[in-house]
């Protein structure tokens, strides 16, 4: 749009679940997008089959299958989150259980980038750089951090550069 992007975080879970938050507040000086986390875990915010964000919410992180946002005016795919790995959510047997997915030597990261290209989103939100939160970083395999470290060296930094190049030239 040529306007500055203003991302408004409404918390996780979000408190606006019954309508497009742009109906609550918008500002024509900006491209306003509302953000929440883990749309995969907020069933009222996504289509269960397509995983499209119902009200155009951008997700700053997802566990499990990637959700994606669609521009509410143009109806074009707009944004998707990409992670290298994720921890489990819930307990096996629970209806909302999401099993963990390790890095698998970069396979998960590459697959998530491939899905972003396939869906055709304009914006990829890459999680995470330097997040040293114990609950989220279970071990090296399920850590979503991409910064160079003693375990992987700069492997994921190089992979990130490679995938960004592919994404920009899709």
Predicted feature residues:
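Glycan-processing catalytic domains of CAZymes
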Residues: 1-170
């Amino acid at each position: 749009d040529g306007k500055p992007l203003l991302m408004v975080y409404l918390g996780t879970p979000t408190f606006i679940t019954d309508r497009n938050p742009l109906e609550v507040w918008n500002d024509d000086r900006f491209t306003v997008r509302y953000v929440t986390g883990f749309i995969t875990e907020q069933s009222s915010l996504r289509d269960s089959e397509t995983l499209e964000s119902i009200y155009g919410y951008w997700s700053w992180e997802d566990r499990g299958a990637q959700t994606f946002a669609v521009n509410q005016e143009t109806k074009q795919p707009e944004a998707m989150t990409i992670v290298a790995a994720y921890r489990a959510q819930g307990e096996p047997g629970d209806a909302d259980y999401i099993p963990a997915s390790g890095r698998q030597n970069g396979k998960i990261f590459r697959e998530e980038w491939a899905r972003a290209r396939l869906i055709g989103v304009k914006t990829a939100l890459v999680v995470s750089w330097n997040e040293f939160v114990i609950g989220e970083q279970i071990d090296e395999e399920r850590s979503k951090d991409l910064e160079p470290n003693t375990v992987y060296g700069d492997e994921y930094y190089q992979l990130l550069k490679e995938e960004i190049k592919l994404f920009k030239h899709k």
